[in-house]
């Protein structure tokens, strides 16, 4: 589930 966490972080960075 590491990929999901990384993906969520990238989405959060977006405005």
From Swiss-Prot:
Disulfide bonds: none annotated. Inhibited by EDTA, but not by PMSF. Activity is not dependent on the presence of calcium ions, phospholipids or FXa inhibitor. Monomer. Expressed by the venom gland. It comes from Bothrops atrox (Barba amarilla). The keyword Protease applies. GO terms for cellular component: extracellular space. GO terms for biological process: proteolysis. It comes from the Eukaryota. This is Venom prothrombin activator. The keyword 4Fe-4S does not apply. Keywords: Blood coagulation cascade activating toxin, Glycoprotein, Hemostasis impairing toxin, Hydrolase, Metal-binding, Metalloprotease, Protease, Prothrombin activator, Toxin. Binds divalent metal cations.
């Amino acid at each position: 589930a590491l990929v999901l966490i990384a993906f969520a972080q990238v989405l959060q960075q977006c405005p």
